[in-house]
Amino acid sequence: MIRLECDYAEGAHERVLRRLFETNLEQTPGYGEDLYCARAREYIQQLCQREGIDVHFLVGGTQTNTTVIAAALRPHQGVIAATSGHINVHETGAIEATGHKVLAVPSADGKLTGREVRRVYESHWQDATREHMVQPGMVYLSQPTENGTLYSLAELTDLWETCQDCGLFLFVDGARLGYGLMSEACDMTLPDLARRCVGFSIGGTKQGLLFGEALVLSHPALRRDFRYHIKQHGGLLAKGRLLGVQFCAILEDGLYFELARHADRLAMELRRAFETRGYEMLFDSYTNQQYPILPDGLLAQLEEEFALTVWSKVDGGHTAVRVCTSWATEPQAVQALIRALDRWEET
């Protein structure tokens, strides 16, 4: 079985495993106060080309999103997100469990716009009964989106300026940030992102680490006492150096971005293969996640050899699936899927 349903089916890049083994018996301070976490923070600060930022390391994406959103919002506030946003559909109500409502906004492509955010904000403040409603206090988006689509630099800038006008925090979930930044369609850099939000994450779990997300915070209100919030939400890892070692290994010479570029390149090869054979795509994705619409008969045949994620039923005879490459996907796996498409065409 060739697994192309997600980007976390493999363990970790061999360099990461080697560094963990080499440092295994070293004795270091706990809770991220070690030299490896310090070095990884320096790498990230240099990549962001921005002073006045704090970098924290957490184990997973849901933990990261929940901790930062709960820290940013007052008890009566909620976070604006696209209906398809990860915190709204794939985190088991984690945000709501902290007492904060997700204010979901419909979006065909998974992206929010400054206009939509302003509409939600003004709708609340123009309502005479607003004190009986959840107040918007934050905007959540991911780059890339849950649908593999990308925000342009202009779109992100518009959202950032809107949030500043409205007094809203803007947070960017970067669980797949490398795949977004290395996409052929991406026109922004990491420093661009770092200057247009109050915080963002740099995903490792889906991009070559065993586990781990780096959280970058720039707003003073979020930076203050943030380690208290991490501990309260169960995220302050006693053996925190395991996160620092991994991020050092993958960031020190651009390996993180090289692996992301590899996944994107293979995903685009698959997209071209689907499109040249007449299959439409559900979303216009230029990242490692592709969403072809397939005849149900073809899907049944593919599922004998490949693990794919069924995304949505399109009509009585067609289904959209997610085909996902990763940092570790072999070119042979992509070629095997393309050959399977050709066999179907020949029947």
Report each predicted region and the residues it spans.
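Conserved N-terminal alpha-helix of the aminotransferase class I/II PLP-enzyme fold
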Residues: 14-61, 83-88, 94
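Conserved PLP-anchoring active-site segment centered on the Schiff-base-forming lysine
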Residues: 71-89, 118
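Conserved C-terminal alpha-helix-loop-beta "cap" of PLP-dependent enzymes
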Residues: 74-76, 268-345
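Hydrophobic beta-strand scaffold residues
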Residues: 79, 102-103, 170-172, 281, ...
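PLP-dependent aminotransferase-class I/II
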Residues: 99-137, 141-146, 151-158
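Active-site C-terminal subdomain of aminotransferase-like
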Residues: 108, 135-136, 142-145, 150, ...
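Catalytic PLP-binding core of fold-type I/II PLP enzymes
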Residues: 151-183
